[in-house]
Amino acid sequence: MRPQRCHPVGSKFSDRRKSATRCPMKKILWCLFILPILHSSVQAEDRIRIGFPELIASYSTLPLGQKRGFLKEEGLQAEFIRMNSTVGLATLITGDIDYYTTLGAGVAAAIGRVPVKIVACYVPGPTATLIARPEFKSVLELRGKIIGINVFGGNLEIIARNVFKHYGLDPDKDVKFLAGGPLQARFSSMTQGLIAATLGGPPADFLGKKMGFVVLARAHELFSFPVTGVFTSVKKIKERPDEIKRVIKAGIKANRYIRQNRDGTIQEMMEWLKIDKEMATATYDSVGKGFNEDGSLPEDGLRLLIEESKKAAKVSREIALSEVADLSILREAQKELGIK
């Protein structure tokens, strides 16, 4: 048996052994101190679920806000779920999602006395363009022609009707609408001469030009018609106003980024929309300036949206703006961001 060596207290070897014994204890104590801090930091991010209907540029605000860290700055972590407006409304009311982003669906639901309200708007004008066969040089030349839309009664028909009204044409008498399904099917009908023109959101204008068609009008240059933003349940407005304010602020920051950072936004659109750079660039150039910088909901556009929704639902009673929108939290968010 090897004899144990004894080292006097205070010797170098004894001090090293004490140090080696103390170090693990220090590390353990440090971990016990820092882990709750890290845990609380992670827990500080509230998880929210946001519904959207389709992968198009006008719904880019909050996904870009997530990617660029604007939601994180507000202590939020979002999950984005693609769903149509019918499912979106149902899951909003049950609390399975927190927000939905198609404002037309929110207005229609509120008019139908579903307890939801718009709290912010990020794209205040319609992004659709009127695209025609090359022989047509103006909107007025479409008098008496067949215009393709996706479905009857949808937003695209509403936008089309208002485009023709803007140019002095009666959409019920001067043109005929034909429901032709998806954009590519309508482009095919245009190529065959079955319809004279159609409407579509980006990148419809880019694709149409590549096929030899011409853009006759951009709806957002003609009138306000709130397209995307945030609406939520009345219950959440009452119970979680601070969370709503943080969502609104993140969206405003994202919109400012979109308007001020062309290259960065094009890259984000490529990734989120799964399109190539050429198409993303054309999409940005078509709609980039359509995003607002303050989250405001234009009153004239909201009134138009209400009237069109009333017609579709055959509702005759007067609808106050306060029935479909609550902008008190938006004003607080704007104030905190220095927006007058």
Where are these regions (language model features)?
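Positively charged n-region of N-terminal signal peptides that target proteins for export
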Residues: M25-I28
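Secondary-structure end/capping motifs
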Residues: E239-R317
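Pocket-lining segment of extracytoplasmic ligand-binding domains
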Residues: G104-A105, F177, P182-L273
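Short, glycine-/small- and polar/acidic-enriched structural segments
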Residues: E45-P182, R186-Q192, A196-P202, V214-A219, ...
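Conserved C-terminal helix/tail region of periplasmic/extracytoplasmic solute-binding proteins
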Residues: K310-K340
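A bilobed periplasmic-binding-protein/Venus flytrap-type ligand-binding module shared by bacterial periplasmic
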Residues: L64-G65, A128-K137, V227-D242, G290
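Sec/Tat signal peptide C-region and signal peptidase I cleavage site
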Residues: S40-A44
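Bacterial N-terminal signal peptides
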Residues: W30-H39
